[in-house]
Amino acid sequence: MYTIAALYHFTRFADPADLKPALLDLCLAQGVKGTLLLAKEGINGTIAGPRAGIDAVLAHIRALPGCSDLEWKEATSDHPPFGKMKVRLKQEIVTMGQPDVDPRARVGHYVEPEDWNDLIRSDDVVLIDTRNDYEVAIGTFEGAIDPMTESFRDFPAWWEANKERFHNKRVAMFCTGGIRCEKSTNYLLGQGVEDVYHLKGGILRYLEEVPAENSTWQGECFVFDNRVSVGHGLVEGPHELCHGCRRPILPEDRNRPEYEHGVSCHLCIDETSEADKMRFRERQKQIALARARGEDHLATH
């Protein structure tokens, strides 16, 4: 059984590059795999491995400057969620492209999962999903507004174009684990919105703590590992990835004429050129050859 830990923490690292070697070495030594992002504004990522290995890595992160109160969310999987370990240096741990946004200064009001339903059912509350379009497509909260953004960078422009619709409304926001809402609520407060709320622990904590019979969640929640999606109780969902576009699809979508394993699906068939598809086919060939030799291929990670 693999323990999965999803974490983020906003702090201030003087030089993130100095932190990378020891963190990566520890993960490798402990058999932990996944991706961790380091930036001057903090750390973000998801890792998986044996219980003892995850505990060791979390203890190391909590000992980093300003990270003693690190929080994380856990789940389990009976198969490895990641193929390798990566520690990457970034400009932002979640990219919004707004230099003035600083969640350490202030964020919206945190709302516990058990109080979320009452808030979003209020007539004076507008509910906004801050995730990307392909994530929203497989599940969201009842009544939520989908900004239809392709990346989190698009959110500020969407807000600027639509903010008059929400005049005199309280704004409630949510995302997968909470990190995007740390920035989006700070951004809205900076734009003069007075009453801003966000779901503490994100969708994942809601699905873990709120029983399905009391839930206002509809569908599955996309996750950034080999589980692809989870439902109530964080039970692994039916979705899988199209490795041509990295979007979630259902098993029955593999029966569509547009589907070619590792190359295309009904969502991306018209988005790539024939040259792209030839490259994807060659990639799949190399993956198959590597597996036949009992090796991992980088494209599978």
Curated annotation (Swiss-Prot):
Keyword check for Ligase: no
Reactions performed catalytically: uridine(34) in tRNA + AH2 + O2 = 5-hydroxyuridine(34) in tRNA + A + H2O
Residues of the Rhodanese domain: 121-215
Active site (UniProt): C175
Known EC number: 1.14.-.-
GO biological process per UniProt: tRNA modification
GO molecular function: oxidoreductase activity, acting on paired donors, with incorporation or reduction of molecular oxygen
Keywords: Oxidoreductase, tRNA processing
One of the Pfam families matching this protein, by short name: UPF0176_N
Transmembrane segments: none
Enzyme class: oxidoreductase
Function comment: Catalyzes oxygen-dependent 5-hydroxyuridine (ho5U) modification at position 34 in tRNAs.
Protein family (similarity comment): Belongs to the TrhO family.
Protein's UniProt name: tRNA uridine(34) hydroxylase
